[in-house]
């Protein structure tokens, strides 16, 4: 997609998986750049990408101003490095579904400041283990078992009983140029020398998915052209390919429909899930989160947004 092409409010809402009213609110708060054509508000893809990048820090979605908490910083694992205050509940992960969830928490969870930390699945679990957050989200695939999340929760939270709560299922696959000129169809195509990759950052679920498949095929990542070129979101992976700067990237299906010049090769269904420590499961805030996830009101937020299978939302998947 051309970075300067005009996007409508609905286009941006679809890309970010939020309601149109939320887009207007982001503009009003100065968090999302825009311009006007007559009386119509318009955006560029660069505006949306900048918003995503600027959002990758601790924020309180319920406040009108940008409320990044400067005392929460990143350690060498990409995790947070301060224990939250007693009235703070930090939900960690990168899907914008979590922005909607924390907004609902601000509405329904009394005496709690619901905060967001925008870091990937692996680092989220490390932060949960260290006590820097209360809820991690993860979509990590274990190549040996073919299972999502449970093996990683057990490894990264040793000795800590945890509860895994289902959020949504999404389809992961390859972004390729329109028409698939390189005829890319499976993981085996990564063995080819004529393909350039655009990668996600270490610890992201899509990065782990790629690395696990490479491991199973006996391929070193360093042998792939472009493997060390990393970006921080599905959107920037897709837009890099649309510009011709790479041939292939791993991401979720929804974004492919939002970026011109991109086709999507579906590969596998993934599970995106919430992880909390069992010791806080019976607290009012966690029980409120369960009620929110299971409510028709919350589920209706995703009714008109493609790419989310919410049929199991709010179900307890495993106790570790």
Residue positions per predicted region:
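Short loop->beta-strand "edge-of-pocket" segments that line small-molecule binding or catalytic clefts
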Residues: 84-94, 188-208
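Flexible hinge/capping segments at coil-to-helix
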Residues: 167, 176-197
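N-terminal hydrophobic or amphipathic helices and topogenic motifs
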Residues: 1-123, 129-132, 156-161, 296-320
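Short helix-initiation/N-cap motifs at beta->coil->alpha
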Residues: 117-126, 222-239
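A ligand-binding cleft/hinge motif common to bilobed small-molecule-binding domains
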Residues: 139-153, 238-268
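Ligand-binding cleft/hinge of the Venus flytrap
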Residues: 102-110, 188, 200-202, 206-227
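Short beta-strand-centered segments that line the small-molecule binding cleft or hinge
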Residues: 124-171
